[in-house]
């Protein structure tokens, strides 16, 4: 297809009347793909911004822009810009199927000579934001109007109110007088024809107040956000209310109740226009408001998916409009509640408490229940009224009483956990247990040390078989503090002279031959000493050399005297 002649710098091309607006473009390519085939909607000169990180540093250059509509459903709608109006190869191609938002009358926080006298609008895609500057306001309005016609963005005349308005939030709830108008175009949405549909609805004033006959269906937009590019609407209940971003202006007018004129009308000001996928996070927390007559018209509950059936049954309001569909059976509400609460049944309430319909049998499987009824007893003895809090245990006895007692015990007392033994630590050796000395008598030593003038040594005494089992321990202690180092102080146990039955002990122990003198300390034969019990070691014997001990004492005394004589008195000053 030949390029437009370079002589008219700006021209407005009317849309092709034989082109039917499609709800999606399933085979659209990525941004940057060159597409030369398609219908040219508009072309002209615009000043393009550099990348977002270089807005202040680089120059805003003037480029020749061409807005093309895809020739077939597989061709994307693109906005191409060239170096000049005679170039054959575009510098870049912007895929409008990826356009998320269109803002008009954009102002930046810095001033540049190229944009001071122009009118700026931007196109936001998932990859980059393009700031475009037109020389006149009329030129900017024509560009915005043409882009909105392709992308399916909804336009509004500004009435002094400035702000961002999401196109996904427009027309989500229509009045009860419009169901036939909004629903009659469902076949045209599912099967596109060659003739554009025309809306016959009267445009109401925005914002539309929510009518009382609207039900809240949760997360319809979030469930279909990823399928916004599908070829047709999935289910009938979501068809007139979920907004598709690349639907034509006429289709948006059908859903929202607006009738939009052609491209010839001029728009004096625009609000921010965005596609629904940008506000997907908002719809997850918000809800749509859908008339019940439209949600239930043309399909049954069986045609809905599982999530849609749950959302439809979760609403607790009934519509007051819509003719014969104003009332809904209670079974559907019962199914909806049971779908959210599996394993639980709803019991209806009645005016009479004594009737069988208002009582729940406490133990239906027990064999005593029919016998009680045959005996003519009151039904309240075996039934619990639904609306009453009083429970009678007259006839049912064991199972329920045990259950109630178990519940009271479980609620009143918490289960006590076993104590934690914190001494059990890994890689830690346990301390040895102390010996049991309860049966052993503690040896009481004498508080004084009686001097013995003559050393003596004791030999082993002769005992019988009972006393020979315990060895006789001896100990020698020498007092080195006394001036007479030859004297020895012995600590004999007074119990050593205790006579033993069946044995004899010598009154005068003989002297031992040799230089080593031992001191014999006799303990009770029947009670072992603590040293032998606790340590279990052999007793050491010490040999004392008198000459060396005396020489050492003299040397220490001489050194102490020499040190005292060499030190000056404390009061003297050097």
From Swiss-Prot:
Stored SMART domains: PH
A Gene Ontology biological process noted in the UniProt record is:
signal transduction
Start and end residues of each stretch annotated as Disordered = 1-33, 176-200, 215-234, 293-331, 418-513
What is the species of this protein? Homo sapiens (Human)
Question: From start to end residue, where is composition biased (Low complexity)?
Answer: 457-478
The record's listing under PROSITE patterns reads: PH_DOMAIN
**Compositionally biased, Polar residues: which spans?**
181-193, 302-318, 424-442, 502-513
Gene Ontology molecular function = transmembrane receptor protein tyrosine kinase adaptor activity
According to UniProt, the name of this protein is GRB2-associated-binding protein 4
């Amino acid at each position: 297809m030949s390029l437009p002649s370079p002589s008219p710098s700006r021209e407005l091309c009317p849309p092709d009347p034989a082109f039917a607006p499609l709800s999606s473009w399933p085979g659209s390519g990525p941004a940057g793909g060159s597409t030369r085939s398609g219908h040219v909607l508009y072309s002209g000169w615009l000043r393009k911004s550099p990348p977002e990180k270089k807005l202040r540093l680089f120059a805003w250059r003037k480029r020749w822009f061409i807005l093309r509509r895809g020739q077939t459903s597989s061709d994307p709608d693109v906005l191409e810009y060239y170096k000049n109006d005679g170039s054959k190869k575009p510098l870049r191609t912007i895929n409008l199927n990826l356009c998320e938002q269109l803002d008009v009358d954009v102002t930046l926080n810095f001033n540049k000579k190229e944009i001071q006298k122009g009118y700026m609008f931007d196109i936001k895609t998932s990859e980059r934001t393009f700031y475009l500057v037109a020389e006149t306001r009329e030129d900017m309005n024509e560009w915005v109007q043409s882009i909105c016609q392709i992308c399916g963005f909804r336009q509004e005349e500004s009435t002094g109110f400035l702000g961002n308005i999401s196109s996904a939030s427009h027309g989500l709830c229509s009045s009860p007088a419009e169901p036939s108008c909004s629903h009659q175009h469902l076949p045209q949405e599912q099967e596109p024809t060659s003739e554009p549909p025309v809306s016959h609805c009267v445009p109401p004033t925005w914002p539309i107040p929510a009518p009382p006959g609207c039900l809240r269906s949760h997360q319809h937009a979030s469930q279909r956000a990823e399928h916004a590019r599908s070829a047709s609407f999935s289910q009938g209940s979501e068809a007139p209310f979920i907004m598709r971003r690349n639907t034509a202006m006429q289709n948006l007018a059908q859903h929202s109740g607006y009738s939009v004129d052609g491209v010839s009308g001029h728009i004096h000001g625009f609000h921010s226009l965005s596609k629904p996928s940008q506000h997907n996070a908002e719809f997850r927390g918000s809800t749509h408001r859908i008339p019940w007559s439209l949600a239930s018209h043309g399909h049954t509950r069986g045609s809905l998916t599982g999530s849609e059936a749950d959302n439809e049954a979760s609403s607790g309001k009934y519509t007051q409009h819509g003719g014969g569909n104003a009332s809904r059976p209670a079974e559907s509400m019962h199914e909806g509640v049971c779908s959210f609460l599996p394993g639980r049944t709803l019991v209806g309430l009645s005016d009479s408490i004594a009737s069988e319909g208002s009582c729940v049998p406490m133990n239906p499987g027990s064999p005593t229940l029919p016998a009680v009824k045959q005996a003519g007893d009151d039904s309240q003895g075996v039934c619990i009224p639904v609306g009453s809090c009083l429970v009678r245990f007259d006839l049912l006895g064991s199972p329920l009483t045990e259950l109630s007692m178990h519940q009271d015990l479980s609620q009143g007392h918490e289960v006590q956990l076993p104590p934690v033994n914190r001494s059990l630590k890994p890689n830690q050796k346990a301390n040895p247990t102390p010996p049991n000395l309860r049966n052993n008598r503690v040896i009481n030593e004498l508080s004084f040390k009686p001097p013995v003038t003559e050393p003596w040594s004791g030999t082993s005494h002769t005992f019988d078989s009972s006393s020979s089992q315990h060895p006789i321990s001896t100990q020698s202690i020498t007092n080195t503090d006394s001036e007479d180092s030859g004297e020895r102080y012995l600590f004999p146990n007074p119990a050593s002279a205790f006579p033993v039955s069946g044995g004899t002990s010598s009154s005068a122990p003989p002297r031992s031959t040799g230089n080593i003198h031992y001191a014999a300390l006799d303990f009770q034969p029947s009670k072992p000493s603590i040293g032998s019990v606790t340590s279990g070691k052999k007793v050491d014997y010490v040999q004392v050399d008198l000459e060396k001990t005396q020489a050492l004492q003299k040397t220490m005394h001489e050194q102490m005297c020499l040190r005292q004589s060499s030190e000056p008195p404390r009061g003297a000053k050097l």
